[in-house]
């Protein structure tokens, strides 16, 4: 059976992402691993041009709320800067020297193609997650005597309308450690935007104003981990028609849901999204 195509907009959009460790194993325990995940998350996001609105890293899974910006042409100098962020200065210098040799030899087309291969990985949800998870898997396997895949299949994604839907998801993400009874308050958990913002993390604090983390999120919402589209009725209706092939051509009627005090609408979930 062919896997379902992922719902992705070609314009600026917000997404709720969840990815689990294979076999639900608790392989992400410990501060060293979680700190590394957060560092790699922001490096992959910078490389991809993605804005991390919120995150939480648990022992066997993580949640993200991200904004993928409009597609735009990225200058060569910016591509090279991002290569250094993701791969380090040594790799960046290698790329610069290689480009200089190609250009000195008059191979401008080959030099442009090399930059384009990196550029094509930027500004895209799937490429961002591929970069992030592959880099993390390589690091984990090398440092923790692990072999094979680290993750349980594809990540799940929920397309969000900016506004109440994003705010609700941010609140849900921040309250994960509270629901798991690890901490009493969301801001007491270090490996989330809520906790990092309290520790004066400027990147994390950008998403904190959206936080609605309170007792409304003390119950687990399965609907948020099944994928699809969430927002106002008009938003969900419009996009469910646009992405009708993702629903096997069947008309999908948005169903009302109440999340974090907000009245929203959702499509039916896509388990393999």
Feature annotation, model-predicted:
Residues 1-59, 67-273:
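Short Pro-Cys-Gly-centered "Cys-loop" motif that presents a nucleophilic cysteine in a tight turn
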